[in-house]
Structures are given as C-alpha cells and as structure tokens.
C-alpha cells in the first residue's frame, strides 16, 4: 500500500497543490482574533470574516481574498512558525510538530462531513462580521499567549 504524500514528505517538500490540500477547510483561521495591547494575548472570537461562507466554511473569494480583506493571512512554509495561534487540529501545525492527521481530516475521511459532525469547523458557531457590533462580546475562550 502506498503511503499518502503527507506521510512521506516534509512540509517543505510538498507541491503547492499538496500544501493547499492540507487545509481541512474548518474556517478557524477565518474567525477574527483580538489582541490585548498591553499583554499581547490573543483572544479568539466567533466573528467570521466577511468573505467566509459560514455554511461551507470556505472563502467566497479565495483567489482575490487579499483585495477584499487586506488583513487575511497567507499561511506559507516560511511563516508557519509565526502563527502560534493555529488550532491544535490544524494539519499544518500537526505535521510541523511531527504528528499525524486526525481521522476526520478530509484527506483521510474523503469528505468534510466528519469534521463538521465533530464540531471542528466553525459552521455551528460563527456569526457574520456584519451582524456584530462589539467583537469583545463574542470572545470564545481564554487568551492564547504569544511566544
């Protein structure tokens, strides 16, 4: 049986298509975060970027997202270590830490159903940015410290 590319290649060795396919499409990167100016602590909210289709958990303008959302992140092999706030379930984070992908990951499960059923995606918690007046009212958890 042939091993999957993520089991045989490092993140640096992956093609652009392989890299992109690692994203499970959970939408967690597309939720806004708040940073405390005094402590640099990061607070996660359930406020979704305007470009996120909450039902599908996909960007509605992925190819042109930076034109619509200049603060959108572009995760690359080079800046991956700087995104310490990535969820513990993130494939990029898991592989960078030498861990396997989760059973529900679409590359293993074959679709996104298990991810949504397991509440990994933001489908059932995200609210559209345009409907939110005060992001601080939508903080999900305790802060995630930087570094």
UniProtKB/Swiss-Prot annotation:
Signal peptide (from-to): none
UniProt superkingdom: Bacteria
Entry-linked InterPro entries: Puta_zinc/iron-chelating_dom (IPR005358), UCP006173 (IPR008228)
Pfam families with a match to the protein in the record: CxxCxxCC (PF03692)
Family, per entry: Belongs to the UPF0260 family.
NCBIfam families to which the protein is assigned, alphabetical: PRK05170.1-1, PRK05170.1-5, PRK05170.2-5
Protein name: UPF0260 protein PMI1174
Taxon lineage: Bacteria, Pseudomonadati, Pseudomonadota, Gammaproteobacteria, Enterobacterales
